[in-house]
């Protein structure tokens, strides 16, 4: 029985620059060959004009209405980092950042690259802060770094997710204080704890040895931690029960691993798949092809296209697409006997470096899928395809139908 190999270019959708997008520019003979044999269309990850986060977009793509199941990004980040959340836990997504003496954010990613030595120093600092917070407030803190500047912070105790972010979400704005968003003692306590953590981190981090070295090397210091996306673990029916599909996900990013875990997918990672625009995909594709013999659906997440977009790096985005295509080439014969889906979770145009709400291209190839006249995978061409315009939440039912795994509606 054939399986589905689903390739997701995070933030892959784009707007034309000089009449061309990264998908249109990239030399990707394998993807374009599959395109010439399959059905193309355009996909609204959530709905037309809605600017999706990667979390809400992936929930929708995995077949779950984000308006019903989304409880904040932090819980997914924590799951993806390998943490087990207990009932009542509140998790936040974190960024290591750089601020000036007045608390203005200079870089929300502290230059993005964080060495293992720096990660260890930050985790040690957070462990010390956690001890003080536990004594003072009775709230347990668990911090874990994930990829580059990213991390997760879990609060355990009499806490609430009903608090505001400390991340201003833009450079040149002041680091925010968290505020309770409801009149409860749990929300008030949570905001107080977050503000104490934020304050203590900046006070101590500025004098760390790692920052002395970073300054000598001309790198930005790590002197702030930004929190956002507080949430708790939602109750979600596993994808195996909801769609009768046994699924696996391969991802190097904690968020995507977390969403996949939350919906009951088995989660894998692969050498070279670190969640950056420099990732190499040979091992990830090899693993995906191997897993296709054991799963109905194998999902491969490619983060580098989004990272390049946020950096405004057109050539870098093209390079990510081309490296993935090259990794597919040795397995073309295998792919031709199975189903292949290629799409994005949202557009992140190079020109604005942020998520936008336009539709993205989608390809569905399979031995028994109708072939249309589209021969190049791109925003400029896929709209002409036989698949038409669909929503993210439509993808899993469509795949379940081709796999003959979903139940018939009615008699």
UniProtKB/Swiss-Prot annotation:
Source domain of life: Archaea
Q: In which pathway does it act?
A: Carbohydrate degradation; glycolysis; pyruvate from D-glyceraldehyde 3-phosphate: step 3/5
**Gene3D superfamilies assigned:** Alkaline Phosphatase, subunit A (3.40.720.10), Metalloenzyme domain (3.30.70.2130)
Q: What is its EC number?
A: 5.4.2.12
Chemical reaction(s) catalysed:
(2R)-2-phosphoglycerate = (2R)-3-phosphoglycerate
GO process annotations (BP): glycolytic process
Alphabetically, the GO molecular function entries are: metal ion binding; phosphoglycerate mutase activity
Sorted UniProt keywords: Glycolysis, Isomerase
Q: What does this protein do?
A: Catalyzes the interconversion of 2-phosphoglycerate and 3-phosphoglycerate.
The record's similarity note reads: Belongs to the BPG-independent phosphoglycerate mutase family. A-PGAM subfamily.
Protein name per UniProt: 2,3-bisphosphoglycerate-independent phosphoglycerate mutase
